[in-house]
A protein has these predicted regions:
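Extracytoplasmic/secretory N-terminal segments
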Residues: 22-180
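Bacterial Sec-dependent N-terminal signal peptides
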Residues: 1-27
Length: 180
């Protein structure tokens, strides 16, 4: 009896560990676009309270009030609307011909059913890289310590002054602890 209990407890611990690990791996990954998103969108990333849509040379941030969504789901909220906001960051004069690639494919996938088609086996990736967003400058987007980060990789003999980012739709913009 003791051995059975120890085995059961061990299996339960293993199951919980695998479940938590699978959950953490599926969070914050780049979803490929196989037709379930608008053509201009290369990848979508779910973040707490919204999503980020990545296009060539542009990020579109879309956020909603998570508490209101939960209240609507729980049939507590009477209003038919949810507070939401979108804004964008566009890399001005970026090269439209740049190559975008996803790397480190996960085993996780989703299927989508739109009004026009069924999209199967949509995969998720850990990293997105846009080569030559500017001449000699690459953009790499990834997660670090549970935060979405991006690096602009400036290759030798490249001009960093090419980089110009225009923000649109936000209420205000400021630096806090040297972060935007």
């Amino acid at each position: 009896m003791k051995n059975t209990r120890e085995i059961s407890l061990g299996l339960l611990t293993l199951f919980i560990s695998i479940s938590l690990n699978s959950f953490s791996q599926s969070q914050f990954q780049f979803q490929e676009n196989k037709g379930q998103l608008p053509n201009s969108v290369f990848s979508k990333v779910k973040v707490p309270g919204g999503s980020i849509f990545i296009e060539k040379g542009k990020f579109l941030y879309s956020f909603y009030n998570s508490k209101q969504v939960q209240e609507k789901h729980d049939l507590i909220r009477k209003e038919d609307w949810i507070d939401a906001h979108s804004f964008s960051a566009k890399f001005l004069n970026s090269l439209g011909s740049s190559e975008i690639k996803l790397s480190e494919k996960s085993n996780y996938f989703e299927n989508f059913y739109t009004s026009k088609m069924q999209v199967d086996d949509v995969r998720f990736y850990k990293e997105l890289e846009q080569k030559n967003i500017y001449q000699g400058i690459d953009l790499k987007i990834y997660y670090s310590e549970n935060n979405l980060k991006y690096d602009l990789i400036i290759h030798p003999n490249s001009n960093e002054r090419q980089i110009r980012i225009k923000y649109a739709g936000q209420d205000n913009i400021f630096l806090k602890n040297k972060n935007l």
